[in-house]
Amino acid sequence: MDENKTKPTGKCPVMHGGNTSTGSSNTDWWPNALNLDILHQHDTKTNPLGSDFSYREALKTLDVDALKKDLHALMTDSQEWWPADWGHYGGLMIRMAWHSAGSYRTTDGRGGGGTGNQRFAPLNSWPDNVSLDKARRLLWPIKRKYGNKLSWADLIILAGTIAYESMGLKTFGFAFGREDIWQPEKDTYWGAEKEWLANSTERYGSDDRTSLENPLAAVQMGLIYVNPEGVDGKSDPLRTAQDMRVTFSRMAMNDEETVALTAGGHTVGKTHGNGDASLLGAAPESADVEEQGLGWHNPTGSGKGRYTVTSGLEGAWTTHPTQWDNGFFQMLLNHEWELRKSPAGASQWEPVSIKEEDKPVDVEDPSIRYNPMMTDADMALKVDPEYRKISERFSRDQAYFSEVFARAWFKLTHRDMGPKARYVGPDVPQEDLLWQDPVPAGRTDYDVDLVKARIAESSLSISELVATAWDSARTFRGSDMRGGANGARIRLAPQKDWVGNEPARLARVLVVLESIAAATGASVADTIVLAGNVGIEKAAKAAGVQVTVPFAPGRGDTTDALTDVESFDVLEPIHDGYRNWLKKDYAVSVEELMLDRTQLMGLTANEMTVLVGGLRVLGTNYGGTKHGVFTDREGALTNDFFVNLTDMKYTWKPYRKDLYEIRDRKTGEVKWTATRLDLVFGSNSILRAYAEVYAQDDSKEKFVNDFVAAWVKVMNADRFDLAE
């Protein structure tokens, strides 16, 4: 080909029939417009496996023993293109798994290793994840071999677990069941900063290190948890201890688990900073095409092995960094440490004096020894009084340390998987753990029709029946599979006292429903859901539509002893647009809050629309307010909300902040009132398109059927047993 013919001419060759990366987007033109993309980010069209593929079914054909054997072999099969430190990939695989699971935060349940999200931006290019692209590429032959029987999400976590086993740790167990996503997660808020490792003051409300912005758990943009050099890169182990306590607590870890995970993660492997970090090439997401998804090209020396640069700190923590032992605590507690600089210029702690034989050897030449090092987080385990007590106990009792760490590692790597019912595989521990939110199995042998009849005969109103069932189920969040109606925790602390659950109304309703459950043999959890179903069926009948709401019995009733009150505090709703309620005013708009809750519940924009329209006319608003109840037939499941929202004989006038009057255009008479959220369904072009469908004369039955389908989806969101 003539070289001159390939030179750019200055004109774009694309005919602009479709938009890929050029041109302005709607967001560019209208940056404040409501963005519904987070509700459709994992559409089945992006999944190459197809909508009929079941990962749980595929897992049944996985040869787990062969897979584990292959992973054990991989650990010591050093590759020339990316050689293993000391001939063992254990440290690299553990860091990969740690950084996958460690992005989890309890506040909204997002992050974590449950979706294989480390394969995509931004996580694949975070500064804290330098070289993990190599770890995943080392795993590719195994992923290729086992294909769709093994997700990337499971493989990444299993590789870290097998790495520990290969170095001598008796692990607590492992569960398969994590399903891959196929594009970046748009719903996860990682922070507002526009540059990596920006000063942490941008995400703190004050000098108090506990004021870290919710829902974040990492102290800086691009880090998994704390800065290894100290707060904002300034060494101060006591201040770093404060950061650790906050970040690990937001990962659901207590002090003992924090010490165990930090020490256990640093018992093996090393940091890498033998070079100039400023010379590293682009991260994977912005690297040139010939890099094929790899990043951070290192031009120093061989660019690998002893010349590897990741965090910028350099050195191993222990004398024997490829074996599980108590060397970390012996090294940390039995030496005095001073602050020094790594070859890359990073601040790290090194021993004032140390015996030559206690130094770790070079990763390539065992005749060369170097000083061990400690991060600021490691030093925090020595200088913080509470961390120090725990460290000293671990140093005296290797067996106890190993047990605590193994359990903490299992918790770290499984916390975002949800209840034990989602676990698959031969190594699932038999023990039920409190953080798994255990729910005893429920009965299915009772008379469902009898329960429904008793509910229908009760004094409870349609709004009470529906609102109680909704409040029980709405806590579900698909981010970490927690919450939901199963277990009937709405009758226990802390949920029974949550303001959003209207405790007085709830207590009154529960007295009736609990008596019905006791008399019929049904669980309270099933009875609550059936109560909502009965309310909907009665409301549909009042609207002239006969419908039976699908129901699957089998929910159990959990107990106070099986409920970690503090752990459930993060599930407390502080807003619920479906019931037109805000606990207080927030800086974020009500419609954005609504989208966040909807996404966590796993609902689409269409499902959100039909549910809001139905719940409004059923009179389920918090406190019985009439905002958005655009009907003269409250309690009947009609499409009146949409009919009147889209009727041009009305005009909408603000009369207070975020509150509006709906007036007759001719007479000026106030017909109804509405919140800002109610009106969004008529003002946003996408939501209005859905609203118009349900407002049509031929959509009365469609509206009821779609409402019922969305309702059942919410009620069954946590019924993982039904997936079997």
Swiss-Prot record:
SUPFAM superfamilies in UniProt: Heme-dependent peroxidases
GO annotations of cellular component type: cytosol
Alphabetized Pfam families for the sequence: peroxidase
Keywords: Heme, Hydrogen peroxide, Iron, Metal-binding, Oxidoreductase, Peroxidase
Crosslink site: Tryptophyl-tyrosyl-methioninium (Trp-Tyr) (with M-251): 98-225
Catalyzed reactions per annotation: H2O2 + AH2 = A + 2 H2O; 2 H2O2 = O2 + 2 H2O
Residues joined by cross-link Tryptophyl-tyrosyl-methioninium (Tyr-Met) (with W-98): 225-251
Record note on modification: Formation of the three residue Trp-Tyr-Met cross-link is important for the catalase, but not the peroxidase activity of the enzyme.
GO biological process, one term: hydrogen peroxide catabolic process
Region (Disordered): 1-26
Keyword hit for Heme: yes
Tagged with keyword Metal-binding: yes
Superkingdom assignment: Bacteria
Chain residues that bind heme b: 266
Active-site positions on this chain: 99
Entry's EC annotation: 1.11.1.21
Site (Transition state stabilizer): 95
Cofactor: heme b
Cofactor note: Binds 1 heme b (iron(II)-protoporphyrin IX) group per dimer.
GO molecular function, one term: heme binding
InterPro entries (alphabetical): Catalase_peroxidase (IPR000763), Haem_peroxidase (IPR002016), Haem_peroxidase_sf (IPR010255), Peroxidases_AS (IPR019794)
Protein function: Bifunctional enzyme with both catalase and broad-spectrum peroxidase activity.
Oligomer and partners: Homodimer or homotetramer.
Family membership: Belongs to the peroxidase family. Peroxidase/catalase subfamily.
HAMAP family membership: Catal_peroxid
The protein, known as: Catalase-peroxidase
Organism: Pectobacterium atrosepticum (strain SCRI 1043 / ATCC BAA-672) (Erwinia carotovora subsp. atroseptica)
Phylogenetic lineage: Bacteria, Pseudomonadati, Pseudomonadota, Gammaproteobacteria, Enterobacterales
